[in-house]
């Protein structure tokens, strides 16, 4: 099993090209099921979860072709299976996003209950309740969600009991081919949801309220393929910016989207970073100074993203002063904390809050990645640790970061993959 070894770094310096967003690419690939003609997705990152999504589409009978240059073509002409099996779904929670498209276009879907990161229950009941309101008959049996609808799904009014990105995406895709108008209230506003909505519009969907908590979808008879470019990955961008801040460096992220990262950029400025942005780039300069501690509290977009929480734990662990990090989205999302403590970090956990007292340097150690973002935080920690840090179980990292060691090497870091 692959590992990463990281040695203490000089301040990171240079330019890094940001990949397409995993969390936008996955639902957009699933949306290919809705299209009656060829659908081409560009700026698709080369990641384990993307490979799994393509395998899932092939399993359903779709034709999936890698066109090179981060472009994938999907054809559903021969799609003739409507079951997403356990052996694929167990490795990736986003597989649940095939449910809405299959049901909307074909009237039937069997989807294994999902797996993926071990960071809390993330219940699928919001997905199922919304589809039931649209007329689907659903039962959960033998580990599978079995959904059927006679004719087309029906437009309806859905109020989400809690903000859920995945449920919003599933219902948005289902509503695009429903009979009548669907209104989703308390919808997720994340940029990845907005990206999916723009993709559906390019396919012929009628959606208003994009970027707000109320989405209105007028169902159409059919959707057609198009070519759509996936948005830049805001979490990858934020991770590299934090790495530069921690190492007191200066980097520029290109092919990025500053507008999707405002809460993170604001906190980096609070930490002492000088931030400069253009239309598609972000530059961070620490002027050689140690970052200052910051308080963060995760919440749905446009507030601070839960997927940047672990990285800011590392920033606070190496900052001047004491910072508080509060997690409100997922339970069990501080699994990186014991590993950081093994590296010498001074962290106290009180429920869903960590109180982090900054120190000047960590110590290299052998640590274990427990989920995707935790693994990124451990790599960043290794950049400011005396000696060598080894991160095990980096298959988590490969689910969400494209060519991460090569990108760090390009910024001057000693990050090496060991087979």
Swiss-Prot record:
Residues bearing the modification 2-(S-cysteinyl)pyruvic acid O-phosphothioketal: 117
Lineage of source species: Bacteria, Pseudomonadati, Pseudomonadota, Gammaproteobacteria, Alteromonadales
One Pfam family recorded for the sequence: EPSP_synthase
TM stretches of this protein: none
Keywords: Cell cycle, Cell division, Cell shape, Cell wall biogenesis/degradation, Cytoplasm, Peptidoglycan synthesis, Pyruvate, Transferase
Binding-site positions, phosphoenolpyruvate: 22-23
Reaction(s) catalysed (UniProt annotation): phosphoenolpyruvate + UDP-N-acetyl-alpha-D-glucosamine = UDP-N-acetyl-3-O-(1-carboxyvinyl)-alpha-D-glucosamine + phosphate
Enzyme Commission identifier(s): 2.5.1.7
Name this protein carries in UniProt: UDP-N-acetylglucosamine 1-carboxyvinyltransferase
Gene: murA
Compartments where found: Cytoplasm
Species of origin: Shewanella frigidimarina (strain NCIMB 400)
Single GO BP term: cell division
InterPro entries: Enolpyruvate_Tfrase_dom, Enolpyruvate_Tfrase_sf, MurA_subfamily, RNA3'P_cycl/enolpyr_Trfase_a/b, UDP_GlcNAc_COvinyl_MurA
Any one GO molecular-function label of the UniProt entry: UDP-N-acetylglucosamine 1-carboxyvinyltransferase activity
Leader sequence residues: none
